[in-house]
């Protein structure tokens, strides 16, 4: 398993999906947690248009599920001094 290649592909696919829906956020890097029996790739996206969230999550599931066990979560964030947004996070778990 080439972890650097998977990290790059996950970030690229996430950015393609954000671009498809006209979102300004960019996924610069996907984090990696190495464990003895598995490797977990962690990424997050910031989405300002609430209406596209269900379709964006569907696209994420479709694009990323082939890498391993995929979990996608979303949470509304309301900062004090900037526009509110939906934080979408994903983990892809690959058994070693």
How would you name each of these model-derived features?
Residues 1-47:
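An N-terminal amphipathic alpha-helical segment
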Residues 74-96:
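C-terminal edge-of-domain segments
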Residues 13-23, 59-64, 80-81, 86-88:
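Hydrophobic alpha-helical membrane-spanning segments
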Residues 7, 18, 27, 53, ...:
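Residues marking helix boundaries in flexible regions
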Residues 40-82:
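Short, hydrophobic/π-rich interface segment
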């Amino acid at each position: 398993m080439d972890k650097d290649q998977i990290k790059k592909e996950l970030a690229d696919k996430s950015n393609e999906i954000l671009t498809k829906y006209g979102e300004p956020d960019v996924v610069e890097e996907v984090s990696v947690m190495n464990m003895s029996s598995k490797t977990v790739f962690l990424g997050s996206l910031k989405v300002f248009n609430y209406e596209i969230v269900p379709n964006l999550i569907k696209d994420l599931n479709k694009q990323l599920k082939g890498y391993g066990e995929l979990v996608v979560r979303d949470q509304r964030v309301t900062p004090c001094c900037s526009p509110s947004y939906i934080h979408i996070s994903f983990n892809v778990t690959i058994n070693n």
